[in-house]
Amino acid sequence: MKFFVLTIFPQFFEGFINTGIVSRAVKKGIVDIKSVDLRDFTEDKHRTVDDVVYGGGPGMLLKPEPIFKAYDSITEKGHKPYVLITEPWGRKFDQKFAEELSKKEEIMIICGRYEGVDERVKSIVDEEVSIGDFILSGGEPAALVIMDAVIRLIPGVVGDSESLNADSFSNDGLLGYPNYTRPAEYRGMKVPEVLRSGNHKLIKLWRRWKQIEKTAVRKPELLKKADLSDSDKKIIDAIKKGLSFEDFLKKYKV
C-alpha cells in the first residue's frame, strides 16, 4: 500500500516511518509512505502556503495552488489514491473505517493547518475524516493515527495475525479482554487462576465474559450492534444479575 501525505511539515513523519512495525513494513516493501512538502509546490521566494480569508475572519487558510499542484504531481504519474482530508467535522475514524481503508491500494491524506484549507480543495477529496471531537494544531497527528491503524491491518505487517482478531473493536466490535504475563504474582496481585489452568475452552469462555463485561460497563452501545451468540446472551443475563464468572459456571454447568 502507498500513502501520500500532503503536509507543510514532512519531518513530522520521520520518527513514525522509522519506528516499530511501520518501519518493518516499509523495509519489507509492504508499505510505502511519501511525505509531500507543500512548500515545494509554491512559486514565490517565501514559499508561501497560506493566505487571508476572503470576507474577513481570524487566522489563515492553506492556499489551493500548492495542494492541487502536489495532487497533480502524483496523479500525473499514474497514481489513483483514495483522498482523505483531516477535518474536525469529518466522518469519525474508527476500526470499521480503518478496515475499509486497509483494502485500498493507495491513500492520500491532506493535512490541514491554520483555519483549514480553501474549500475548492474539497473537489479532489473522497472523504473528510475526524479522529475525535477536539481541535489539533494541524492534521499531521491525525494522519499518524490513521496510518498506524490502517497499516497494522495490512496482511504481512503484524507477525501474529491472530492477535488482530483479539483487539478491541475488531471482529465482532466488542472491547478487548485483559491480558497478563509473568510473574504469576506481583505485589500481591495474582494472574487469574483460569488463565494458568491449561483449559483452553474455559480460558476462551473467561475471555469472552471479560469482553462482554468490559463492553457493558464502558461502551454498552456496542453490545446493541454486536452479533451475539446464545452463550453471549447467557453471559449478559448473568452479569445483569450480578453473578461472578464462577457462579456462571456453576449455574450453567459449563
UniProtKB/Swiss-Prot annotation:
It holds the Pfam family tRNA_m1G_MT. GO terms for molecular function: tRNA (guanine(37)-N1)-methyltransferase activity. Coiled coil: none annotated. GO terms for cellular component: cytosol. SUPFAM superfamilies: alpha/beta knot. Its main location: cytoplasm. Keywords: Cytoplasm, Methyltransferase, S-adenosyl-L-methionine, Transferase, tRNA processing. Its EC number is 2.1.1.228. InterPro entries: Alpha/beta_knot_MTases, tRNA_m1G_MeTrfase_C_sf, tRNA_m1G_MeTrfase_TrmD, tRNA_m1G_MTases_N, tRNA_MeTrfase_TRMD/TRM10. Belongs to the RNA methyltransferase TrmD family. This is tRNA (guanine-N(1)-)-methyltransferase. It comes from Persephonella marina (strain DSM 14350 / EX-H1).
